[in-house]
Structure formats: C-alpha cells, structure tokens
C-alpha cells in the first residue's frame, strides 16, 4: 500500500495531566503502561528502505508529548533531509523545554521552507484549564521564541464550554502572532464523565460516548459502515510500544486494556504480528490481517471483530473529529 500519513508516538511521557488523556486515566487508576521514548536508531532501522518523499509525518500519539523525546531534533532532521518527507506536523502542549530548544525548532521550520511545523495545543486565550500542569505563561514564551525564529505555527484550539467565549480573542491573538488558527471539536469530550465539558462535542453526535460504546460492545448495530483512515487515507500509527496499528484508536484500545478484544486478536493471529521488533513495516502491512482480515472483521459476527472500530469510525465516520483551519 502507499503510506500517505504516518503518525508516530515518539514518547509516552508528558509534562501535562490532561483529564481526557489515556495516560492520565491510567496513572489515576494505577495501571501499567510502557513509559519510554522511541530511539533515533529505531526510526532509522524502520524507515531506511522506505520511500517517504510523498509521506506526511505526524508527531503526536496517544500517551505522551513528542518534545519529551531526547532524540527529537535528530529524528526531525532525519525525516526532513535524509528521507525528504512531504512535511512534518508536530503536536505539543508547548509547556516545557528551554527557550533555546524552541528557537532551534523555529529555525528548523524556517530553513525547511516550513515543511516542519507545530500544532500548539492551547485551549483558551487567557486560561488553559484542560491542559493541567501546563503554565500558559511558559507556553507563550516558547511560542513567541519559536515564531520569532521563523517557525510555522498553527494554534489548535479544542472547543470546551469554558473557552468558547474566547474564540474570537484567540483568533485575533493568532493573527497578531503570525499563526494560523484552527478550532477542533472532538466527540470523545461528549462523555458523561468528562471533567471538562463541551457542548460543541454534541454537535458531532448527540449520543454520549458511553451510550455508543455500550452499543458497540453489545454489537447492537446491523452494519458498521466503517470510514477507516487506514484504508481511505493510507494512514498508519506507530506506538511507543513498537507496535504498528492502522490508527491511534486501536493502539489506544490496546493500552487501555478495557476489553479482551486486542488480546483475542493476538491469541488468534500471533502476539508479534505487528511488532516492529520482529517484523519490518513492509512485512506487517503485507500480512493477512492488514490485507484482508481487518476489513472483514468490521462485520460484527466475525470472530476477530473489534467493536472499537465501530465506536470511533462507524456510521460512515460521523463521530470523527471536526477540525477547521482558518
């Protein structure tokens, strides 16, 4: 398959404690997850023989923030200049590291003709309630140094009830700082138990996360109608656990470990089928599960059916994130 988008979780570590983050949830429950960073040498090994000239790299992830990874700058250089990727989009809360680090990234962005750019996850103009443990003052110091060095920036603003009235102010601030502005509505924030509420999430689907999750787990639907990013957009996800998944959602399903669905998959087709320590990216993508079984398993009667596919991407993708870049 053509790999158009690769999302890479460079770290499972983070300075923040966002209430909706899987890492925060696992920490609060005292549950295990791998606390680690991907190494530059691993990135080189995995991608050495793959043509990435038409590929977008997304540095984001489920658990951590890429700026925690000590090899980050080397990895960015590798993708930009050795692999000559189309572009690199890095998402960060921006609340840590020294100013020299951010100046360096700004120069990297400028000198790459802005093929490297940053999505700053800042959810408010004067307050940043969702990003717990993150100093907004420190964030703006880092943003300003990066921008002044010539870095390309997008301010990504998740709409919550507490910050909805500040959207116009944030838009104006972004303009003054030379940043693009993007609002983001995420249906997962329509949870009965969400600490930070979002009316905007209900515009995506009025049903709560728990209601749809219950229907998915009970297989209470006739046709899944999966809008799969892997199949439609040619997207793959690599987690810090060195597993290659079609998307971040199935990786999240694995680390959350709420059900036996992923363990059932491993039991039936082998625990190492998507393990990058055992197989190359090409070998994994040519496996029977990726080529045929994944799509077949969207049928809720299939023995390897994973309800998470319906929960996040079913009903023709109606619960997908809505992102509007201005």
Regions found by a protein language model. Give the residues of each.
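A short, conserved beta-strand element in the Rossmann-like catalytic core
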Residues: 19, 66-67
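A C-terminal junction/extension of Radical SAM enzymes
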Residues: 1, 151-154, 162-255, 301-318, ...
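Exposed loop/turn and edge beta-strand positions of beta-sandwich/beta-sheet ligand-binding modules
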Residues: 4, 53, 232
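Canonical Radical SAM [4Fe-4S] cluster-binding loop centered on the CxxxCxxC motif
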Residues: 1-40, 247-249
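Generic structural signal for small/hydrophobic residues in well-ordered secondary structure
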Residues: 6, 10, 14-15, 65, ...
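A short acidic, helix-capping loop that chelates divalent metal ions and anchors anionic groups
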Residues: 27-31, 126-131, 193-194
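Radical SAM/AdoMet-radical enzyme domain recognition
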Residues: 37-60, 69-186
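Flexible mid-to-C-terminal extensions adjoining Fe-S/redox cofactors in radical SAM and related proteins
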Residues: 1-4, 24, 28, 243-244, ...
């Amino acid at each position: 398959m053509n790999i158009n988008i690769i999302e890479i979780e460079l770290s499972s570590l983070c300075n923040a404690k966002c209430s909706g983050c899987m890492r925060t949830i696992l920490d609060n429950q005292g549950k295990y997850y791998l606390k680690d960073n991907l190494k530059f040498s691993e990135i080189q090994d995995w991608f050495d023989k793959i043509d990435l000239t038409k590929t977008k790299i997304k540095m984001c992830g489920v658990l951590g923030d890429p700026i925690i990874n000590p090899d980050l700058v080397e990895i960015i250089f590798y993708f930009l200049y050795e692999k000559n990727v189309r572009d690199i989009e890095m998402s960060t809360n921006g609340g840590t590291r020294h100013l020299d680090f951010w100046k360096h990234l700004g120069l990297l962005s400028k000198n790459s003709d802005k093929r490297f750019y940053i999505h700053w996850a800042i959810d408010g103009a004067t307050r940043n309630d969702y990003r717990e443990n993150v100093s907004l003052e420190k964030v703006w110091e880092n943003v300003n140094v990066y921008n002044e060095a010539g870095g390309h920036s997008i301010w990504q603003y998740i709409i919550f009830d507490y910050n909805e009235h500040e959207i116009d102010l944030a838009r104006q601030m972004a303009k003054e700082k030379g940043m693009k502005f993007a609002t983001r509505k995420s249906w997962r924030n329509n949870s009965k138990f969400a600490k930070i509420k979002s009316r905007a999430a209900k515009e995506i689907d009025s049903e709560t996360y728990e209601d749809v999750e219950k229907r998915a787990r009970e297989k209470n639907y006739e046709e899944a109608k999966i809008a799969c990013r892997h199949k439609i957009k040619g997207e793959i996800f690599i987690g810090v656990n060195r597993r290659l998944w079609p998307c971040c959602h199935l990786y999240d399903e694995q680390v959350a470990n709420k059900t036996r669905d992923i363990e059932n998959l491993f039991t039936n087709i082998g625990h190492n089928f998507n393990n990058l320590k055992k197989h190359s990216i090409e070998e994994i993508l040519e496996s029977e599960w990726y080529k045929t079984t994944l799509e077949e398993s969207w049928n809720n009667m299939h023995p390897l059916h994973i309800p998470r596919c319906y929960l996040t991407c079913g009903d023709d993708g109606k619960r997908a994130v809505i992102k509007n870049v201005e």
